[in-house]
Amino acid sequence: MRNMTRWSALALVCVTVALGACDRSSPPGSTTATTPPASPPAAPSSGVRLYVSDETGGNVVVIDPEAASVVQRIAVGKRPRGIRLSRDGKELLVALSGSPIAGPGVDESKLPPADRAADGIGVVDIATHAVVRKFQSGQDPEVFDISPDGKTIYVSNEDAAEVSIVDVASGNVVQRISVGEEPEGVTVSPDGGTVYVTSEASSDVAVIDTKTQKVLARIKSGPRPRSVTFSKDGATAFVTSETAALVGVIDTAKHKIASTIQIPKTEGTATPPRPMGGALSPDGQQVFISLGRAGSVAVIDVASRKLVRTIEAVGARPWGIAVSADGSKLYTANGPSGDVSIVDLATGKVEKKIATGGSPWGVVVAVRK
């Protein structure tokens, strides 16, 4: 499906966060699209590519957004969720988990035992689309981020209420740090000095000092914080609060909530917004927040810290979200409907929906330069 031209460079535009009504779950009452089998590894051609983790299919789905088509499926392992490009753009990293999916109200004692051997961070070579390594990760890895120098990975371990620190050179966990209950979102500050970790059940954000590898502060957030997105200068961080329909604005110098942004329900709709994933525009002026069951995306102005518009009817429960390198397109992973939406940011309208099958969770944009 692709020729043997090698990508000379890639850029991570944005990534994030999650797909599921709660921690380890698919949304109640949702249907999961059938996942086609993975295709064999092939070298990618030039142009923009979307890499989408498919939690129920065990694949990373490769999409050509211009052609609006799936061009490959890379089999990576069980429950791929969090997904990022390496800092040098040569590899794709994806969190894999052997924990069974537990929907709301499910008695977890009746689920099959977790397959801890399946836990890890899978590494895919961008040039060949082959899985080349698997890092240790701690239990049930969900979301992770990479240090600016690319040498360290910070992983949320939901089952263990910990963050694992992974040395990229060895692929081993070198430290574990206790954080709040049900940690999910993990974001490294632009200067690499701190890591912000959201804890859903504790309703707080743990701030980890990367030098001491200790928690230096805990920021009380709104209920069920899901993700953190830093401003370009790192002075401000935006934390989503799922069940309060708000975004907290954190002063990172003080490690405190400075203000909150309430996301109103769309008039005439019964479904409240559920702030989930976040992505910063390339120029750093706006933050895009996926609103889950509301099927929309909130747009926040970084300078004024205000909601400036809401993009409606994006897709079924958008969560994972990313922005194109030129800032003209927005991409959302819509788990219940098994597709990815491409939004024209000039018009605020969905241009295309690309069927992925399975349950798309996170999305990464890679571009050839």
Where are these regions (language model features)?
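C-terminal or otherwise distal, non-catalytic regulatory regions appended to signaling enzyme catalytic cores
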Residues: M4, L19, D23-R24
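Predominantly soluble domains enriched in secretory-pathway, periplasmic, or organellar proteins
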Residues: C22-K369
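Bacterial N-terminal signal peptides
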Residues: A9-G20
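Bacterial N-terminal signal peptides that target proteins for export
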Residues: M1-A11
